[in-house]
Every structure is written in C-alpha cells, then in structure tokens.
Amino acid sequence: AMDHTDAKNFLGLIEYGNQNINSAQNCYWLESSLTMFPVEQVELLCHLKNNDWKLSKTNVDTVIESMFIANSDGKSLYGKTGTGRVDDININGWFVGFITSNDNDYFFATNISLSENDNQFLSADGLSASKISLSILRDLGIYAYEYQSE
C-alpha cells in the first residue's frame, strides 16, 4: 500500500493536477482538495500511453489494459469513469480516455457537474459523462459506440 508521502511524491512525479492531498488522508481522489482540469487529464493520458515517466512497462500496460472498453472498425476505445459524491448526491462526473487506430490516437476528457441551482434529483456521474463523450466522438466521426440497454 502507498502511504500519504509516497502518494504525494507520485502525484508530483506525474504532475497530477494541483497535487494537494492534504484535506483527506485516505480518500484524496474523492471530492477533496485534489483537483485536476480536463486538459490536465488529457495530458496525463498522453504521458501514460507513451510511458513518459519511464515506469514499469508491465504496470503501465496493466493500467491501459484495465481501461479497455471496446473495439470498433479497427479502433480501440479505452476509458475510465469517475463520480464525486457529496451528501449522497452525485455532483461531479468524469469520463477520460483515448482511442487508438492505425492512423491516429485521440484523447478526451469530459467533466460534468451540478451547480446549486440544478434540480436535486438530477445526477452528474461518470456514466452520464461517458455517454456525452461517446456521443461527441460519434458526431465527429471518430468512434461509433452504442451503449447496450441494461
């Protein structure tokens, strides 16, 4: 397991957002002082895919493989969702990822959030962010993916 100091050092190595994990010793990835902008998420994914940090190839490959979602028309979709909750309400949704093909790689990050004026019964979560991302990627002709009904 990674202790607080190791986690802070690793976040510094990969330049993860503001690197501030002081407000929550064990849950810093949740709604806390650790923040990151979508463009920083895209930069992080580019560095991860290229292993610019010179981490163990096996570890990097394992992380990337864990992000695999689907193949379509010779393209592979990789992604990760995230949901921030406060008072049992989903207030922050993320979907970050990339698409690989023979011609090009595409990186993306979508963040949605609820404001104080939003209807309390709506939700900003990772699933919603992923649906928005995939709709945009489809509209741009980059990747066609359809969610299967549950």
Task: Tell me what each language-model feature is.
Residues 1-50:
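Mid-domain, small-residue-enriched loop/turn segments at the edges of structured enzyme/sensor domains
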Residues 1-3, 42-150:
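Structured C-terminal helix/loop/strand segments within mature extracytoplasmic catalytic/sensor domains
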